[in-house]
Regions:
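Flexible coil segments in periplasmic/lumen-exposed cytochrome c-class electron-transfer proteins
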Residues: 37-42, 46-51, 97-155, 241-245, ...
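Extracytoplasmic electron-transfer domains, predominantly the class I c-type cytochrome c fold
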Residues: 59, 63-65, 69-120, 213
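Asp-box/WD-like beta-propeller blade repeats and closely related beta-sheet repeat scaffolds
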Residues: 241-292
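Surface loop/turn motifs at the tips and blade-to-blade linkers of beta-strand repeat domains
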Residues: 151-156, 194-195, 207-208, 272-275, ...
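Beta-propeller domain segments
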Residues: 127-142, 202-207, 211-213, 221-223, ...
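Conserved beta-strand position repeated across blades of beta-propeller domains
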Residues: 153, 163-164, 217, 292, ...
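Electrostatic cytochrome c docking/interface patches
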Residues: 30-47, 287, 346
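Gly/Gly-Pro-rich "capping" loops immediately C-terminal to redox-active cysteine motifs
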Residues: 42-46, 57-88, 190-201, 311, ...
Length: 521
């Protein structure tokens, strides 16, 4: 967090009074959008330690003359916007100044994000990759269904990404640095499929490799044709100017399809690949890598902000990254794609401005494409993806940069910038829980959840249920809290819900099983 650093006694008094009164004087008022860029040299953590820790403790827990900012309710609201507006407008009757007269709007929002992060136990920089999984004991009673959670498959690689469930209830699982694994329905036997595109392992830092296996997904008519699609990061060395200049491997997303015979990958066909000149030397962490089918014979796939700085190229329609693409099932280009005929654009592009897409699904009720996406510090999103839509990165985000500054990269290069040209999320998640994959539940095992979004998270280790009415959220429930890093989610043959859980000491597949327990109204 960047705040204005002033050494005057008056400023110190005002800053202390702000924290003393925050817990009892938050007011709920609408706030304007924040656009002005700012760059100050002092992070929030440093400023807090300098100005406030003596009163409120290093962990915001409170001290002799300062009330705690965590661990208790705030009288006038807990949400990010309520906290931000309270800071900006103040509460003069209680002696709290209007900080909009002292701090920039970006600084105020950054301060609010920091406070809410701490209150929600989602501090910046904590990703819970080593935190043990916590399976609930006994029955979980949610708002509409009771269920239990049980492990089905254990001992998977630490870097799993995707799973598909076959008609015979076997599992296909991608392990980023190892490849494609076939697992029996009872989880007792598994086989690595031979002959798939190669997955690369970085011995020095497995979590920052180049050349990962990403999504596995079954053709809509898999039962008849056996086609399986693989979305992976195609690696090359000494293959373009950037790779040669830095003497590093480069990669870019690629989609193929094939079939499995025994333990062999056969009949491979390339669906789409990009010119080697576009391959990037950054880690595959930002690769995106999700895939979805609609009901009209189209394949969608996502590519995240793959440039080393995660900013450049995302808005450039001549480059593949930072985009969601749409092709026919055989890789040909649909004639109604939004940029067909535009010589300055790739004709596979469906939408742009994507930072780190984590989930991609088609809503069966509307055939609309939906996506989940990571923001920077805050600004995780659940979006409806419109053809030709611009989803903002790096021009705009409801989150903030990791430094605390506003997200506004590249605006000064535009002739003009209008917020109304940016597609806004259906649901914004700030602070960031690190949203992951999701489904629109269609099974019969949990009938009261039908058509709801079931969404995993990584950092916050939660499983969400979100009810949607058309294009708006009407209910949000955390089904599992402090549980595990949920990397993928799928519905099985009988409507049971399977979760792919990621952990550094070995990933797992777990299953939600409905229980006949009466739920109180």
């Amino acid at each position: 967090m960047h705040c204005v650093s002033q050494d005057s006694t008056e400023f110190r008094k005002l800053f202390i009074s702000f924290f003393v009164l925050l817990s009892v004087s938050l007011i709920s008022v609408g706030t304007g959008k924040l656009y002005a860029a700012e760059n100050s040299g002092l992070t929030f953590e440093a400023l807090y330690e300098q100005q406030c820790a003596v009163c409120h403790g290093n962990e915001l827990q409170g001290e002799a003359i300062g009330v705690p900012l965590v661990g208790s309710d705030l009288l006038h609201g807990q949400s990010l916007e309520e906290v931000a507006v309270s800071i900006a407008e103040g509460y003069p009757d209680a002696g709290m100044p209007a900080w909009s007269e002292t701090l920039t709007t970006t600084q105020i929002r950054t301060l609010a994000v920091f406070i809410v992060e701490q209150r929600d136990s989602m501090p910046y920089g904590e990703f819970n990759v080593r935190t043990p999984m916590q399976f609930p004991e006994g029955v979980v009673a949610s708002n509409k269904h009771a269920f239990t959670v049980e492990p089905v498959v254990e001992g998977l690689d630490q870097l799993t990404f995707s799973m598909a469930i076959l008609p015979d209830r076997q599992f296909l699982v991608t392990e980023k640095t190892r490849g494609l694994r076939l697992i029996s329905a009872d989880g007792q036997q598994s086989t690595m499929i031979q002959g798939t595109p190669k997955a690369y392992h970085n011995e020095e830092n497995p979590r920052a490799g180049v050349g990962w296996m990403l999504e596995v997904i079954l053709h809509p008519d898999y039962a008849d044709n056996g086609w399986i699609y693989l979305h992976f990061s195609d690696r090359c060395e000494d293959c373009n100017t950037m790779s040669r200049q830095f003497n590093r491997a480069a990669s870019m997303n690629k989609v193929v399809r094939g079939r499995i015979e025994g333990d062999q990958w056969v009949d491979q066909e390339t669906i789409i690949e990009f010119d080697k000149a576009s391959y990037q030397i950054g880690s595959d962490i930002g690769a995106g890598g999700r895939t979805a089918f609609d009901s009209e014979g189209h394949l969608f796939f996502s590519i995240g902000a793959r440039s080393p700085n995660t900013m450049s190229g995302v808005q450039d329609l001549a480059l593949p990254w930072g985009k969601i693409h749409r092709v026919n099932l055989d890789g040909s280009i649909p004639e109604d794609n939004p940029y067909v005929g535009d010589d300055s654009a790739l004709d596979s592009i469906w939408s742009r401005g994507h930072r780190s897409p984590q989930g991609l699904e088609v809503n069966p009720l509307s055939d609309e494409l939906w996506s989940t996406e990571h923001g920077p510090r805050g600004g995780d999103e659940l979006n409806i993806i419109e053809p030709g839509g611009n989803y903002g990165w790096p021009l705009h985000s409801l989150g903030i940069n990791y430094s605390g500054s506003e997200v506004n990269y590249g605006r000064d290069e535009l002739e003009f910038f209008r917020l109304e040209d940016i597609e806004m999320p259906i649901v914004d998640f700030t602070p960031s829980p690190a949203v992951s994959s999701f489904i629109f539940y269609q099974g019969d095992a949990f009938p009261e959840w039908k058509n709801d979004v079931l969404m995993g998270t990584l950092k916050s280790r939660e499983l969400f249920r979100i009810s949607i009415d058309g294009r708006r959220e009407i209910e949000q429930e955390i089904l599992l809290d402090d549980f595990a890093r949920v990397r993928d989610i799928e519905s099985g043959v009988d409507g049971e819900i399977f979760l792919l859980l990621e952990h550094i000491e070995g990933s797992q597949i777990a299953r939600l099983i409905p229980e006949s327990v009466e739920i109180a109204e």
